[in-house]
Amino acid sequence: MATDETKRAAQEFLAAQFTEAVQIEEERLNAQAAFAFAPKVWKRVVETFMAQCEAWNAITKTESLTCKETILGDLRIRCAGKPDIITVHYDSRKLQVILRNTARPEHEGDSTFFIQGYNGGTEADLSRNNQRANLEVVVLGELRVLAGIGRTAK
């Protein structure tokens, strides 16, 4: 004979199983979305860098930043009069975007971002430390470091 406590425990068990199944399905959908939307995310990264460089140059009224895509598809950004360079590399197999900025202090390594799916597989975006990355802020910070004026305004 089942007591109320037994019924409650069995219901909790069923709820936990259902929640776990839903979580597994969402993770599967998000992984599929990451692969499906990765080229679009990379395109947005390229467009953001290009747009920020164009805006920077429009404000300075000179070609102080040059942003070019290499034959391999990487981005290279240079600042006039500076020896340093930003290289942005997209690894489609690992779903990674790697930013190398030679103007960064040595103790700061490359910035690695992952392309992850979100919202049950309906979208994908860059993330770092399992948090969505604000691409515009990241790009502006990297350009500021490249130009030698520091990551943030004083």
Positions of PLM-derived features:
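Generic signature of mature, soluble extracytoplasmic domains
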Residues: 61-78
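Contiguous, amphipathic alpha-helical segments that mediate oligomerization or scaffolding
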Residues: 18-66
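Alpha-helix boundary/N-cap detector
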Residues: 1, 5, 33-36, 40, ...
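Intrinsic disorder/low-complexity polar-acidic segments
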Residues: 73-154
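Eukaryotic low-complexity, non-globular regulatory regions
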Residues: 1-25
